């Protein structure tokens, strides 16, 4: 029995390696990660490794845990995402492991393991996973871990031992210092568990859980604060992470439409099927109440902000509840065939894998880097302006010369002024610009290019497919004489234009 239990996590670890390799652009299969957010994180990690102070010398508004993680990844490789790739494998494994444990709370069927693999496959191949290296991806195993112990308490009145509660607190602390909006999940869970404990006269047990969870949060917080105290940048941390996110960041919508409508409609339907049935099957009222509390409050939190579609990746934490459909199912050959077909269909509609195989994966950043690297000199500094981080800093092995090295959804006149001064000063040899069709804040941060710069690279390429943009556009596309599968494989396209300007001698 012990041997079987040992082989199971090894199998899940190998499967996590497989799906991460196939679907994350951080893996060695892909030449680069084209996502601007991921490149921002890695650029900041490189800058911190080179001695720059976070939020003071280089700026973004996410939490410090994210950048410290990328600093550690940069220790392994400064111009690739191999360090993040290894972290992603661990996260995928932990997510599937605790999803499996959650399923086994409600079923002893042998279907739980293959179903767990299917959920892991669907999660990483979904549009919500995007390119990989998102805050939501790294938070998903933490939510799955916490949800398992909360469901176990709600279903069986079984309280976690002290070290399990401590680890839940450490996970909560990591989320606190990565993206505090996700704490809505915990708020809903804690309030629901408090009510359940009160009804069953288990307030003492709940008190012990809260005590050790709090200790875990403190344990995760101490090294974070110690880092900023040592660097004398606590005030910058508070201002950049809390004040900016609460009062300034609103997530600029694209093309004048709410970002929610980017959410792929088909995957939304699949996600609903996987999670919502809990409310329509026979289960203890405590379990339903807990799911409603965590699920509902987290979903409600999205209504308070401009939502990027990949935020909804967090909802896959609830996907193990699909076991309610199969809790008495005995898997047969047809079961495995069905699972395989679903996996193949999901992979066949995965943008990352499809474009890698058909040769249309965006590679213009590598071409730009090759041009810049071929003409390197002592003053060949690189500056991106009026655009996101394209990854040019990693591939040219440069660091940004300025603090605000990319445009963000914060329309800040000080950031605009700093970027404009750097562009017009003529201090850098190369100016790199990305003009994206999906971003509306380019014009705000635009700056005139000095006359002594000339364009040496100009290329437009496919950046991303969008299954839908707005409801009326989605319905309009369906009126065309094409079958649904053709629509899936030939959706709305988004192009980006990449330019490099070189200063004349």
Ranges and model annotations:
Residues 184, 300-334:
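Hydrophobic/aromatic-rich transmembrane helices and adjacent perimembrane loops
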Residues 128-138, 308-309:
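Short acidic/glycine- and proline-prone juxtamembrane loop motifs at membrane-interface regions
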Residues 86-107, 145, 149:
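Transmembrane-helix motifs of polytopic, lipid-linked glycan transferases
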Residues 97, 266-298, 319-322, 326:
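Hydrophobic, aromatic-rich transmembrane alpha-helices
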Residues 357-442:
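Short periplasmic/luminal acceptor-recognition loop of GT-C membrane glycosyltransferases, typified by
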Residues 99-123, 140-141, 157-159, 163:
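Transmembrane-helix signature of polytopic, membrane-embedded enzymes
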Residues 163-182, 186-191, 219, 295-303:
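Membrane-interface alpha helices of multi-pass inner-membrane proteins
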Residues 144-167, 201, 271-286, 327:
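Membrane-interface transmembrane helices that cradle and orient dolichyl/undecaprenyl
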